[in-house]
Amino acid sequence: FDNSEVPILTTKKLAWKTAIKELLWIWQLKSNDVNDLNKMSVHIWDQWKQEDGTIGHAYGFQLGKKNRSLNGEKVDQVDYLLHQLKNNPSSRRHITMLWNPDELDAMALTPCVYETQWYVKHGKLHLEVRARSNDMALGNPFNVFQYNVLQRMIAQVTGYELGEYIFNIGDCHVYTRHIDNLKIQMEREQFEAPELWINPEVKDFYDFTIDDFKLINYKHGDKLLFEVPV
């Protein structure tokens, strides 16, 4: 994607606020507690909720671990990334990783999107995302949109222009139960992409709230229901 427009589906309505809330839960709160997500009126992780109320050592848990050394102290992956992008932009090590082999068995679900790599070149922030697995009906539209939002957020708080956005998928698939509705979706009219407004006053990554995002002129087809595969 060249980022001339926001990558969001128009052939059906995407629950874009839910996608951003999940992003904030993982990247900003660095939480694995499903109750934190429920407080945002989001329930997409409820069926993976364990007895302790969490999804185990997955997603936000990995980002919140203080395992990087910075100025004599330990910080987590997100804080390290933000610092390095600002202070060492030419580094080829701007990477976050959710795939921790030592803790995969402690995760309610192994991460689908597991890695980001960031590049700064000529004042622009580029992002490459890697997903081991993406179902095209549900997971892909969510992930492609929300990580593009993340790129825009981090570009804003680090002071860079928006660069290219790459989303790599190892295993891209369609579930049999989704085929009929996907055929309907494929026949639908596509509309021009909306404009994503992000509050320009926010300069700290941890100050973003859902109220700092607006989709302007989001024209889309009717909602299509797809059963969540478990």
Curated annotation (Swiss-Prot):
Cited Pfam families: Thymidylat_synt
Documented EC number(s): 2.1.1.45
Gene: thyA1
Reactions catalysed: dUMP + (6R)-5,10-methylene-5,6,7,8-tetrahydrofolate = 7,8-dihydrofolate + dTMP
Active site positions: C112
UniProt subunit comment: Homodimer.
Source lineage: Bacteria, Bacillati, Bacillota, Bacilli, Bacillales
Alphabetical list of PROSITE patterns matching this protein: THYMIDYLATE_SYNTHASE
Keyword Transmembrane helix: no
Cellular localisation: Cytoplasm
Family: Belongs to the thymidylate synthase family. Bacterial-type ThyA subfamily.
Pathway: Pyrimidine metabolism; dTTP biosynthesis
Binding locations of (6R)-5,10-methylene-5,6,7,8-tetrahydrofolate: D135
Name of the protein in question: Thymidylate synthase 1
Originating species: Bacillus amyloliquefaciens (Bacillus velezensis)
GO annotations of cellular component type: cytosol
